[in-house]
């Protein structure tokens, strides 16, 4: 039995709750990928995964779906195959597209979710998703910035209004206030962002965000733990 060890920890009643739960994850990259896999390994029975992107060589340093063999493939397709290889009985809905306020019905019309995981990078899309979750009274947890960070022990779960240091959280906090949204559970880091180094020999004027294997992954696992605990009231 796949979930025998989990049942020993949380009990059969809670395991059944997870089996009958449907979670939708927006963004299956560095944070969302680890969150997704942890959710289904914990026993979530139905999952929807949303991501328009393909696996890139630059994802190899931190994303659970990134392998030499998956470069160039749709992230949702790679993730779906991986999840079903863990639990063949899992129900997976794949959305290889970008979420926006213009295609809300694709994800929310005639669908019910136990929880929403927001691992979106783009601020406008992030805000629109949070607004929809609040309008529909669906529990949601949002990932704040994990780039340019080195210390995973500085990550914590809190309400958006109690966050500090994180530049993304500052923007989200301000914009949610403008939208009249007072509460939002987030995972964020209290670590001051590092200034990214210039790559040797690079002529690019744009400075990309630095990242490492163990910070986004930890954020994803924290998100998964919060979802599981909330669904089971643990």
Regions from the PLM with identified roles:
Residues 1-24:
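N-terminal charged helix/coil linker that caps or initiates catalytic domains
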Residues 19, 111-114, 120-125, 135-136, ...:
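Glycine-rich phosphate/adenylate-binding loop
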Residues 25-27, 50:
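Conserved N-terminal Rossmann-fold NAD(P)-binding element of oxidoreductases
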Residues 31-32:
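Hydrophobic/small residue at the entry helix of a nucleotide-binding pocket
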Residues 41-46, 135:
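Conserved S-adenosyl-L-methionine
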Residues 44, 49-87:
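Glycine-rich phosphate-binding loop and adjoining beta1-alpha1-beta2 segment
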Residues 102-113:
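Short amphipathic alpha-helix with an adjacent loop that forms part of the alpha/beta core around
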């Amino acid at each position: 039995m796949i979930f025998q060890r989990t049942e020993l920890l949380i009990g059969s009643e809670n395991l059944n709750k997870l089996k009958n739960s449907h979670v939708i994850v927006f963004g299956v990259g560095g944070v969302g990928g680890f969150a997704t896999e942890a959710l289904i390994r914990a026993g979530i029975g139905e999952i929807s995964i949303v991501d328009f992107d393909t696996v890139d060589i630059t994802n190899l340093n931190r994303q659970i779906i990134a392998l030499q063999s998956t470069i160039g493939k749709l992230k949702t397709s790679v993730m779906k195959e991986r999840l079903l290889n863990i639990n063949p009985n899992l129900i997976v809905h794949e959305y290889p597209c970008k979420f926006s306020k213009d295609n809300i019905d694709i994800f929310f019309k005639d669908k019910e979710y136990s929880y929403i995981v927001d691992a979106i990078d783009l601020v406008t899309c992030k805000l629109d998703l949070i607004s929809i979750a609040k309008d529909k009274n669906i529990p949601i947890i949002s990932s704040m910035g994990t780039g340019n960070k080195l210390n995973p022990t500085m990550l914590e779960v809190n309400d958006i209004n109690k966050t500090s240091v994180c530049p993304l959280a500052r923007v989200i906090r301000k914009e949610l206030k403008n939208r009249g949204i007072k509460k939002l559970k987030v995972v964020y880091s209290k670590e001051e962002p590092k200034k990214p180094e210039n790559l040797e020999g690079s002529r690019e004027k744009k400075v990309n965000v630095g990242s490492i294997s163990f910070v986004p992954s930890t954020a994803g696992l924290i998100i998964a733990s919060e979802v599981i605990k909330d669904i089971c009231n643990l």
